[in-house]
Amino acid sequence: MKETFIHPTALVEPGVELGQGVSVGPFCHVQSGAIIGNDCELMSHVVITGATTLGAGTKVYPHAILGCDPQNNKHKGGPTRLNVGVNCIIREGVTMHKGSDNARGYTSIGDNCSFLAYAHVAHDCDIGDYVTFSNNVMIGGHTSIGHHAILGGGAAVHQFVRVGHHAFIGGLAAVVSDLIPYGMAIGVHAHLGGLNIIGMKRSGMERKEIHNLRHAVRMLFDRTKPIRQRAQDVLAAIPDSPTVSDMISFINVDTKRAYCTPPLDAAHGGAGHDSDED
């Protein structure tokens, strides 16, 4: 394992926990209490507050600022944290805020995530593994992003919204409602534009499961019954599909937001814009 390197112009305060093989570049500032895992690299002009933990192998590009106070007037300055997983890529100008003391108290980032230039993660968010934020993505406080989700450039997600795993949000979309697993949100305000078929294929999902999800979405969003009742109808019609069960579990969780739905003129709430099916 390589030796830890700290550039002469960097400020690493006493009380920082540095792993083996860490590289701290020019003009970085790492505050007391920060935990930097093995083989992390801070390129230059990076600020890591003492409320931050970086998992091993994470690389942070210039002018990123991690772990500052939440932009939440209810936060009273109590001890909270930002926890970043292993092998993440955090590009130029990214900001991530720690949690609030009036909420769950920490912001969590999963493993193997990529945050492209100037993306923003607000307080108390929960982000899964293998998530991609494209340039200038912004998510509000208390937002939940599932594993393998992709957020296109300039997309904005309202506070408290839940985005399911393997979902896709198009560039410049404004998402104000919960997005189902495997769903695709497009537009301002964003609507459900179908399923993330390309992402499902890339993940190796079987064709049968893709068909099951298509059927489930058509049933869920036909607007003839309350959505929780429709969800039970879906389980009865497609009882043995793990992906459909995941989707229905997402629907059945209590939420502060509505659901991202197809446009009113979409026939039977169908899966428009997901035509990349074999």
Swiss-Prot record:
Gene Ontology CC annotations of this record: cytoplasm; membrane
Signal sequence region: none
UniProt-listed Pfam families: Acetyltransf_11, Hexapep
Pathway, per record: Glycolipid biosynthesis; lipid IV(A) biosynthesis; lipid IV(A) from (3R)-3-hydroxytetradecanoyl-[acyl-carrier-protein] and UDP-N-acetyl-alpha-D-glucosamine: step 1/6
The organism's place on the tree of life at top rank: Bacteria
Documented EC number(s): 2.3.1.129
Keywords: Acyltransferase, Cytoplasm, Lipid A biosynthesis, Lipid biosynthesis, Lipid metabolism, Repeat, Transferase
InterPro entries assigned: Acetyltransf_C, Acetyltransf_C_sf, Hexapep, Hexapep_transf_CS, Lipid_A_LpxA, Trimer_LpxA-like_sf
Record has NADP as a keyword: no
Cellular localization per UniProt: Cytoplasm
GO molecular function: acyl-[acyl-carrier-protein]-UDP-N-acetylglucosamine O-acyltransferase activity
GO BP term, example: lipid A biosynthetic process
Catalytic activity: a (3R)-hydroxyacyl-[ACP] + UDP-N-acetyl-alpha-D-glucosamine = a UDP-3-O-[(3R)-3-hydroxyacyl]-N-acetyl-alpha-D-glucosamine + holo-[ACP]
SUPFAM superfamilies, sorted: Trimeric LpxA-like enzymes (SSF51161)
Function per UniProt: Involved in the biosynthesis of lipid A, a phosphorylated glycolipid that anchors the lipopolysaccharide to the outer membrane of the cell.
Subunit structure as annotated in this protein's UniProt entry: Homotrimer.
Family: Belongs to the transferase hexapeptide repeat family. LpxA subfamily.
Protein name: Acyl-[acyl-carrier-protein]--UDP-N-acetylglucosamine O-acyltransferase
Protein species of origin: Brucella canis (strain ATCC 23365 / NCTC 10854 / RM-666)
Primary gene name: lpxA
